[in-house]
């Protein structure tokens, strides 16, 4: 059996169905996970729980969107090194506007792409 890192994957997604789908994929691959419905909840989680293996970040969310979350993450020395994968339905030039992210996943999500990306970012022990 593959053993993944002890640190969970943080899923930041406001759409409950999308969030549950991502978490089901993570469960299937053997990854622990935590959930946040917006950037504010994600920052609160990070303050309480420490660094996940990677953050799967939606962009369009209420309360605090992914753009603002990412800016605050990069401004915080404790959080800036946590890898981020942007999860979005919009692929228009995002790589230019999100330098330094670990990858992009486009909706609708493809299980194989998610698994390959996570295996690269959070290798098995």
Residue ranges and their predicted role:
Residues 16-34, 103:
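Two-component/phosphorelay signaling modules centered on CheY-like receiver
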Residues 44, 67-80:
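Short amphipathic alpha-helix used as the core "switch/output" element in two-component signaling
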Residues 57-58:
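Active-site residues of response regulator receiver
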Residues 61:
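Receiver (REC) domain active-site loop signature in two-component systems and cognate sites
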Residues 68, 90-106, 112-116:
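Alpha4 helix (beta4-alpha4-beta5 surface) of REC/receiver domains from two-component response regulators
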Residues 85-88:
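Hydrophobic/aromatic residues positioned on beta-strands within the core alpha/beta folds
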Residues 1-10, 110-125:
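Non-catalytic signal-transmission and effector/linker regions of two-component phosphorelay proteins
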């Amino acid at each position: 059996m593959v053993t993944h890192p002890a640190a969970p994957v943080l899923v930041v997604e406001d759409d409950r169905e999308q969030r549950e789908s991502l978490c089901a994929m993570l469960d299937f691959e053997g990854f622990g996970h935590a959930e946040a419905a917006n950037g504010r909840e994600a920052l609160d989680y990070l303050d309480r729980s420490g660094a996940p293996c990677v953050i799967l970040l939606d962009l369009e969310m209420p309360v605090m969107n992914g753009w603002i979350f990412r800016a605050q993450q990069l401004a915080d020395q404790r959080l800036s090194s946590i890898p981020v994968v942007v999860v979005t339905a919009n692929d228009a030039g995002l790589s230019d506007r999100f330098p330094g992210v670990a990858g992009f996943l486009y909706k609708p999500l493809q299980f194989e792409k998610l698994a390959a990306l996570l295996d690269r970012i959070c290798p098995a022990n």
